[in-house]
Amino acid sequence: MQRFLLPLLFLALSPPAICHYSSSTSSPSSSSVSSDASEWRPARATYYAATNPRDAVGGACGYGDLVKSGYGMATVGLSETLFERGQICGACFELRCVDDLRWCIPGTSIILTATNFCAPNYGFDPDGGGHCNPPNKHFVLPIEAFEKIAIWKAGNMPVQYRRINCRKEGSMRFTVDGGGIFISVLITNVAGSGDIAAVKIKGSRTGWLPMGRNWGQNWHINADLRNQALSFEVTSSDRSTVTSYNVSPKNWNYGQTFEGKQFETP
C-alpha cells in the first residue's frame, strides 16, 4: 500500500453562523459531467488515508473544515503543474482509472473539487518518488474517493482527467474575517467553473473596490467597511460574473458567513 500524505495547513476555525440576506439561485445537488466538458488528459493519482478528523481541516486553498464547508471527502490535492499557485482552487475535475485491468473498477469515474496542493519533493526525480514534481500532472485523493475508481493496492495509478462544470447545492458563501480596516473574505461553494479570477466588494457607502487574492480562495482588502451592508461581485475563470447585493446587514461581525447568488450551470 502506498500512502501519500498532503501537506495540510491546520486552521483553528470555529463553525460560523450562516446568515441569509439576499436571494440566490440554487443548482442541482449532485455533480455530473457537463455537455462542454474538456477532453480527457493523462495523469497519475495516489491516495492518503485520513486517520484523524483534523486531516479534513486546512489545505492550501483555505477552505478550513472541508466537511463543514460542504466539500466533504470528494476533494483532491493537485501537483504544482496543475495548481496554478492557487488560482485553480474550487475547480472540479472528473477522474477515471485507465490502463490497468487488475486494479481499475470498470465503468467508473469520480468528480472532485480542488482544495489542496501537493508540494514537490526535489529529493526525488519526477519519475521516482517525486510524484508531484514538475512536469508531472498528479492528483492526491482521500482513500474514500480513490476506492471509487480503483482498488487501493494500485498505489500510483494511471488516470485520465478533465475539467468539468461544478454543480453545487445552494448559494455561494462569503465568510468575512479580519480586524479593523483589514477585511479577508473566504468564498466557498462556487458553481460553474468553480475557480475565481476576480472579486470586488462594496459597502453601502462606497463604490466597488477590487480585492486581492491573499491565498487560495481568500481575498483581502484594506478598507473601513464597518457598519455598512456588504455586496460582492465575483468573476470566475470563464469570465462569468455574479453580483450579490447587500448579502450582509450593516451590523455584520467578523467570523460570520453570508449567502449570495450563485453561478448558473448548464
UniProtKB/Swiss-Prot annotation:
Q: Which residues form the Expansin-like EG45 domain?
A: 58-171
Q: Which CDD domains match?
A: DPBB_EXPA_N
Q: Which residues form the signal peptide?
A: 1-19
Q: What is its main location?
A: secreted
Q: Name the GO terms of the biological process aspect.
A: anatomical structure morphogenesis; plant-type cell wall loosening
On the tree of life, the source organism's domain of life is: Eukaryota
**Limits of the Expansin-like CBD domain:** 181-260
Topology in the lipid bilayer is annotated as: Peripheral membrane protein
Subcellular location per UniProt equals: Secreted, Cell wall; Membrane
Per the record, GO CC terms?
extracellular region; membrane
Query: Per its UniProt record, what PROSITE patterns does this chain match?
Result: EXPANSIN_CBD, EXPANSIN_EG45
Q: Which UniProt keywords apply?
A: Cell wall, Cell wall biogenesis/degradation, Membrane, Secreted, Signal
Can you tell me which family this protein belongs to? Answer: Belongs to the expansin family. Expansin A subfamily.
Tell me the function of this protein. Causes loosening and extension of plant cell walls by disrupting non-covalent bonding between cellulose microfibrils and matrix glucans. No enzymatic activity has been found.
Q: What is this protein called?
A: Expansin-A13
The source organism is Arabidopsis thaliana (Mouse-ear cress)
Question: From which lineage does this chain's organism come?
Answer: Eukaryota, Viridiplantae, Streptophyta, Embryophyta, Tracheophyta
Q: Which gene encodes it?
A: EXPA13
